[in-house]
């Protein structure tokens, strides 16, 4: 049994290519990109776009991108895309994959030309300036595996008998001890809002405030296991629930989802402005 949010029948979602038989085009086609309004889940969370309680970014890693140079020779590249937290739309991932595939048989004079096109198209889809960085020198580009820092919640030996999302697990979340600490878990699993395909993630929670009850926090994270929502929406829900139930001075929630279709999505939400985000590839990515 899956758990869907109230907005899952919104007409915007019914027009997405997700869950439908689609044509894989190999000629450049920016119309393949599809947007999902961030307001869908934010309205349910009672968030105002004019006064959001967080900052952050959706960091995408591209592993499958290719085009033809002016002589018709294929070029391959990896890339990093950063979508601002306050863009009007998030970018639907299957449409992003189909869009990238449309570059396969299209000619571009340079990597800079491709980067310019990607930046323009993704910014248009998100309705906010998006940054794009591409790499073609794959033999001289470092992309080492890393690990989260802090204390792992997964060592807790707890019994679980319910897998339906339940924020009430966070009742009385904070003690009276003031701390600054980082906690993480590899047990976050949610499901695609449209197809119910499993989405796997590791999540890092860094905060300053009254100490959080680790067992309650882990039980809450596991309760996403049958919940249907997009990656970005899950992270915002987790951020808001921790802020609601905990006595928190500052908070950063950073999830790194496993790769699908040559893309991984890594949403980060934080109480503070950020200039840089650690694009740390984990083992399952």
Swiss-Prot record:
Q: What is this protein called?
A: NADPH-dependent 7-cyano-7-deazaguanine reductase
Q: Which Gene3D superfamilies match?
A: 3.30.1130.10
Q: Give me the residues that bind substrate, please.
A: 91-93, 231-232
Q: How does it assemble?
A: Homodimer.
Q: Where is the active site?
A: 192 (thioimide intermediate), 199 (proton donor)
Q: Does the UniProt entry include the keyword Cell cycle?
A: no
The taxonomic lineage of its organism, from the top, reads: Bacteria, Pseudomonadati, Pseudomonadota, Gammaproteobacteria, Alteromonadales
- Does the keyword field hold Oxidoreductase? yes
Q: Name one GO cellular component term.
A: cytoplasm
Q: What is the originating organism of this protein?
A: Psychromonas ingrahamii (strain DSM 17664 / CCUG 51855 / 37)
Any idea which GO molecular function terms this record carries? preQ1 synthase activity
């Amino acid at each position: 049994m899956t758990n869907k949010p109230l907005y899952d029948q919104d007409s915007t979602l019914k027009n997405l290519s997700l869950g439908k038989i689609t044509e894989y085009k190999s000629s450049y086609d920016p119309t393949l990109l599809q947007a999902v309004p961030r307001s869908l889940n934010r309205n349910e969370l009672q968030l105002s776009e004019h006064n959001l309680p967080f900052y952050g970014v959706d960091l995408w890693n591209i592993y499958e991108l290719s085009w033809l140079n002016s002589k018709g020779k294929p070029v391959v590249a990896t890339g990093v895309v950063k979508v601002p937290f306050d863009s009007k739309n998030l970018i639907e991932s299957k449409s992003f994959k189909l869009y990238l595939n449309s570059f396969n048989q299209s000619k571009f004079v340079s990597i800079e030309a491709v980067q310019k096109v990607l930046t323009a198209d993704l910014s248009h889809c998100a309705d906010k300036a998006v940054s794009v960085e591409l790499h073609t020198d794959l033999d001289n580009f470092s992309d080492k595996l890393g690990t989260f820092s802090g204390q792992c919640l997964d060592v807790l030996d707890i019994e679980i008998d319910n897998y339906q999302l339940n924020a009430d697990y966070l009742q009385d979340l904070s003690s009276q001890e003031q701390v600054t600490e980082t906690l993480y878990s590899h047990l976050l699993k949610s499901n695609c809002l449209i197809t119910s395909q499993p989405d796997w993630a590791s999540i890092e929670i860094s905060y300053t405030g009254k100490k959080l009850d680790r067992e309650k926090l882990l039980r809450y994270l596991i309760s996403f296991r049958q919940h249907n929502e997009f990656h970005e929406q899950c992270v915002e829900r987790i951020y808001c629930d921790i802020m609601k139930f905990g006595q928190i001075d500052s908070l950063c929630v950073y999830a790194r989802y496993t790769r699908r279709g040559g893309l991984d999505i890594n949403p980060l939400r934080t109480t503070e402005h950020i200039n840089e985000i650690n694009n740390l590839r984990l083992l399952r990515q």
